Every structure is written in structure tokens, then in C-alpha cells.
Regions:
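Flexible cytoplasmic inter-helical loops of multi-pass small-molecule transporters
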Residues: 156-169
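Residue-level signature of mid-helix packing/kink "hotspots" within the transmembrane helices
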Residues: 2, 30-38, 121-122
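Helix-loop-helix hairpin linking two adjacent transmembrane segments in secondary transporters
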Residues: 112-159
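Helix-breaking motifs and short loop linkers at transmembrane-helix boundaries and internal kinks
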Residues: 16, 48, 69-74, 103
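Cytoplasmic helix-loop-helix junction between adjacent transmembrane helices
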Residues: 80-117
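Conserved MFS/SLC helix-loop-helix module at the cytosolic interface between two early adjacent transmembrane helices
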Residues: 35-71
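Extracytoplasmic
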Residues: 1-19
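Paired small-residue
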Residues: 63, 74-82
Length: 169
């Protein structure tokens, strides 16, 4: 989610937009990121955490690839909105998973989640920086897709369904 603000100027130039238009696109994407979290409690109970997180990562992977090949404002906007919606799955699902999985060490588990979340937030602008420095804005989204392709098998292997398993002792 932090890729777009880091590349406002490049997006303005590439799509011949002004700052307000890019801000509007990011605002809509951010809104979708927030609102997309709402149905997750129902979907969590129906499908479980592993399926939802894998679905989220697959969606982020393909949406990021769509953003990376965007040649029009419409395609960029719609694929970014999809990216925001798929990304919105993570927080409600992972926090619920933590609360169901850990008994004694829930605070420690949430702390680890927060640390890695902060790393993720700081990686967005860093990925943008190196992409813009050495390639183009498109590559920031390609790298995001690659990262999700790398994380996907790890999620499939290590995310439990919902059994209690306090593993951070």
C-alpha cells in the first residue's frame, strides 16, 4: 500500500495527471483497503485463515502484475483497487489467527506481527526508491508480485488452520 505515495511524481509524469488526481486514486485504493476488511469475519469463519491468506497473496501477486503493465489511468486505477482489496484481507485474518492460535504468548505473537508489519510498511518506499533509481515505477509492483510468490508457499506450509498451537515459547 505504500508504493503509490512513494512514486507520485513518476505517476504524474507517466499518466499526465496532476497531484490531486493521483491523490484521488490513492485515496480510493486506501478506502478499498479499509472497507475490504469488513467481510473478513464472515469469510474467516467459513473458509479459515490459511485459505484466505493464500487467496490474499495470490490476489496481490496478480494485481501487482496488472498494475506493473498498466498503460492507462483506468487500468492502473482498477488494478490498484484490486490490489487494495486483496491486501485488505491480511490484517483481520492474521490478527484473528493470532488470537485463536496463541494462548499464553498472544502479546508476544502480536508484537512479532507488529514488527514484521512495520518492516513491510518501510519496505514499500524502499522498493519504490530502488525501482525508480535503477528501473521504472513498474518494477516496484513486479517486486511486490515476486515477494508474494516467495511468501505463498511459506504461508501454505506454516499457517495452521485454527488449531491451538502456541509455538513462540
Amino acid at each position: 500500500m505504500m508504493l503509490i505515495p512513494s512514486m507520485y511524481i513518476n505517476l504524474i509524469d507517466f499518466f499526465s495527471l496532476n497531484a490531486a488526481e493521483v491523490g484521488l486514486i490513492f485515496g480510493i485504493v486506501s478506502f478499498c483497503f479499509g472497507v475490504g476488511s469488513l467481510p473478513m469475519s464472515f469469510l474467516y469463519n467459513k473458509y479459515g485463515p490459511k485459505k484466505l491468506i493464500v487467496f490474499s497473496q495470490l490476489g496481490i501477486l496478480f494485481s501487482a502484475l496488472l498494475v506493473s503493465v498498466s498503460s492507462s489511468v483506468l487500468m492502473f486505477s482498477l488494478s490498484s483497487i484490486l490490489l487494495g482489496l486483496f491486501a485488505s484481507i491480511h490484517h483481520p485474518v492474521s490478527l484473528t489467527l493470532i488470537s485463536e492460535t496463541f494462548d499464553k504468548n498472544i502479546a508476544k505473537a502480536n508484537a512479532f506481527h507488529g514488527v514484521f508489519g512495520s518492516i513491510g510498511v518501510s519496505l514499500g518506499p524502499l522498493i519504490s526508491y530502488f525501482s525508480l533509481l535503477y528501473f521504472s515505477w513498474h518494477y516496484a509492483f513486479i517486486f511486490t508480485a515476486i515477494l508474494n510468490a516467495f511468501l505463498l508457499p511459506l504461508s501454505m506450509k506454516f499457517i495452521p488452520n485454527t488449531e491451538k498451537m502456541d509455538i513462540i515459547n
